[in-house]
Each structure stands twice: as C-alpha cells, then as structure tokens.
Curated annotation (Swiss-Prot):
SUPFAM superfamilies: Ubiquitin-like. The gene is Fau. This protein is synthesized with ribosomal S30 as its C-terminal extension. It comes from Rattus norvegicus (Rat). Pfam families: ubiquitin. Signal peptide: none annotated. This is Ubiquitin-like protein FUBI. Belongs to the ubiquitin family. One of its GO terms (biological process) is antimicrobial humoral immune response mediated by antimicrobial peptide. GO terms for molecular function: protein tag activity; structural constituent of ribosome; ubiquitin protein ligase binding. SMART domains: UBQ (SM00213). Gene3D superfamilies: Phosphatidylinositol 3-kinase Catalytic Subunit, Chain A, domain 1. Coiled coil: none annotated.
C-alpha cells in the first residue's frame, strides 16, 4: 500500500503495514538527514511508538503521517 510521509518534503512510500514506526523513521532519516531520535511520527496529531507496526497504529492505504522534530526542553 502507499503511504505519504510529510517531513520537510512530502514523500510517498510503498509499505506492507508490517513495518515499524522505527523503520519509517530510519527511512525518513535517509531521505532528509533528520536523525531518527529527533523525529516524532504523528498520525492525526497523535505520536506513534517506535515499536508499533503501522498496522497496529491503524495506518491504512493513502494515510499521511506527519514527521515533526523533537523540541528541546519542551
């Protein structure tokens, strides 16, 4: 299925739903150079846990995930 990831740019990823959020962060790191530990992946404004699979998070085809940077001291 296709998934959209909006970080600094909008990216289209081909995924199965079995990928973990940590794997998506690693992919975003390779595309944009943002370290995985500095990323927060959001689905409808709610942060997703690194260990969870996309399927467990309720991610469906054509979903857009937002990637935000962690705020220091926030």
């Amino acid at each position: 299925m296709q998934l959209f990831v909006r970080a600094q740019e909008l990216h289209t990823l081909e995924v199965t739903g079995q990928e973990t959020v940590a794997q998506i962060k690693a992919h975003v790191a390779s595309l944009e150079g943002i370290a995985p530990e500095d990323q927060v992946v959001l689905l409808a404004g709610s942060p997703l846990e690194d260990e969870a699979t996309l399927g467990q998070c309720g991610v469906e085809a054509l979903t857009t995930l937002e990637v935000a940077g962690r705020m220091l001291g926030g």
